Curated annotation (Swiss-Prot):
Binding positions (a divalent metal cation 2): K151, H182, H239
Organism this protein belongs to: Escherichia coli (strain 55989 / EAEC)
Cited function: Catalyzes the stereospecific hydrolysis of the cyclic amide bond of D-hydantoin derivatives with an aromatic side chains at the 5'-position. Has no activity on dihydropyrimidines. The physiological function is unknown.
Encoding gene (name): hyuA
UniProt binding sites for substrate: Y156, S286, N335
Keyword NAD belongs to the record: no
Name listed for the protein in its UniProt record: D-phenylhydantoinase
Length: 461
């Protein structure tokens, strides 16, 4: 199968050019002008459009069981939504397994979840929910099998203490893996939450007040220092929501420490006022939404390069689930927002089309740096001969209003309802196959492939 994309502006992280792009047997074969492929081939006219590498979302939670509920997107509906939003690769954060389980247990479970459902290519982050000799011995074997990143939690049921974190950081570093972390100070949060509950203050706004930005920033600073103690172990901070944490990361970078950070569209475009609306419960997530001042600080990090990745933390619970389980109490509400379908369009509209970032920086944030950090480069995140033919075509001339009824996830609402975006995703190709075109999903369940990722190699800071 050959596909020729003509007359578009092809953009990579290091530059752009108006040229044609030829994909053959799922692989990019040629870029240039006046390409004349062997017949037969499909021709796609991208006049006036940007031709970007397909998005790489390195933070999703599909089919996750959080104890009180299971998310309503599985690996079909979740990856279908991703495809319709221009994302062609996801790396899913696996949920916790049974108490005391081995690392391999969750990998086998999640490969079963995805095998016959995923529309796009996928991988997983390991999750370390306890530390013992067996777990530490298992890490190098998992890296050899293609899992080169693992997540630690400083909050929730399976939070690790500082000694366990140090052991994990050392072994992951030795094994060629990148440590990712959910950083929040669990003890401080528990104290604040207990105060509010005792006072009968359980409305959605108290979710944010119980998890102040200092709880997140303190945990970020602690992880930075622990990573240094562990032999300058590489560290990746997930879902950054505030400027103080970013200041700590800037300081670590200035000291040449190998740290990277992601943020998410919700922290760039939504704010804490959402908790005071009639539907405030739909915005319960952790870390919570912050104020507009924190948004501005994050946008500075997006613009000046301090933030490396924009992912989604897509973790969808329906409003029916939220209301039935929480009964109006924020502390009982399952956490998470949908967003995997909207990430690329939201960042293009609010970043590229406003002049905050260049098209090249858009690629760096949404595909190139995620692929480099997580062992997928140059197969993913790049349009060059030999790379996978993963493409998203965006038309900057089109304006669209986000409406849930047009989305493809399994939620019953969108936090972005009514947002007007300048720029529309008109086509998504995965390994040369069109899986979304002009508003219509054309992919199929089970076509996605499991990606064995390479050991971690730090990009140049």
């Amino acid at each position: 199968m050959r596909v020729l994309i003509k007359n578009g502006t092809v953009v990579n992280a290091d530059g752009q050019a108006k040229q044609d792009l030829l994909i053959e047997s799922g692989i990019v074969r040629q870029l240039g002008n006046n390409i004349s492929p062997q017949l037969p081939y499909e021709e796609i006219d991208a006049t006036g459009c940007y031709v970007f590498p397909g998005g790489v979302d390195v933070h999703t939670h599909f089919n996750i069981d959080v104890g009180i509920a299971r998310s309503c997107d599985d690996f079909f509906t979740g990856t279908r939504a991703a495809a319709c939003g221009g994302t062609t690769t996801i790396i899913d954060h696996m949920g916790f397994g049974p108490n005391g389980c081995r690392l391999r247990h969750q990998l086998e479970v999640y490969r079963g979840y995805a095998a016959h459902k995923a529309v796009i290519d996928y991988s997983f982050h390991g999750v370390i929910q306890h530390i013992n000799h067996a777990i530490l011995d298992e890490i190098p074997m998992m890296v050899e099998e293609g899992l080169s990143s693992f997540k630690l939690y400083l909050t929730y049921q399976y939070k690790l203490n500082d000694d366990e974190v140090l052991q994990a950081l050392r072994r992951l570093h030795e094994s060629g893996a990148l440590t990712t972390v959910h950083p929040e100070n669990d003890a401080a949060i528990a104290s604040k939450r207990a105060e509010f509950i005792a006072a009968g203050l359980t409305a959605p706004r108290y979710h944010a007040l119980s998890r102040p930005l200092e709880c997140e920033a303190e945990a970020i600073a602690r992880m930075i220092n622990l990573a240094q103690i562990a032999g300058n172990a590489p560290l990746y901070i997930v879902h950054l929501s505030n400027g103080l944490g970013l200041d700590y990361l800037r300081l670590a970078r200035a000291n040449h420490q190998p740290v990277w950070v992601e943020t998410c569209p919700q922290y760039l475009l939504l704010d804490e006022r959402s908790y005071d609306t009639e539907d405030g419960m739909k915005f319960i997530l952790s870390p919570p939404l912050r104020n507009i001042r924190e948004q501005d600080k994050l946008w500075c990090g997006i613009s000046d390069g301090a933030i490396d990745v924009v992912a989604t933390d897509h973790c969808t619970f329906s409003m029916a689930q939220r209301l039935q389980i929480s009964k109006g109490d924020f502390s009982r509400c399952p956490n998470g927002l949908p967003g995997v379908e909207n990430r690329m369009q939201l960042l293009f509209s609010s970043g590229v089309m406003t002049g905050r970032i260049t098209p090249e920086r858009f690629v760096e944030l949404t595909s190139a740096m995620p692929a480099r950090l997580f062992g997928l480069w140059p197969q993913k995140g790049l349009l060059a001969p030999g790379s996978d033919g993963d493409v998203v075509i965006i038309d900057p001339r089109q304006s669209q209003q986000i409406q849930h009824r047009h989305l493809h996830d399994n939620a019953d609402y969108s936090p972005w309802e009514g947002f007007t975006c300048q720029g529309a995703i008109v086509r998504t190709l995965s390994r040369g196959e069109t899986i979304f075109c002009d508003g219509t999903f054309t992919g199929k369940a089970g076509r996605g492939r499991f990606l064995r990722r390479k050991p971690f190699v730090p990009p140049v800071l």
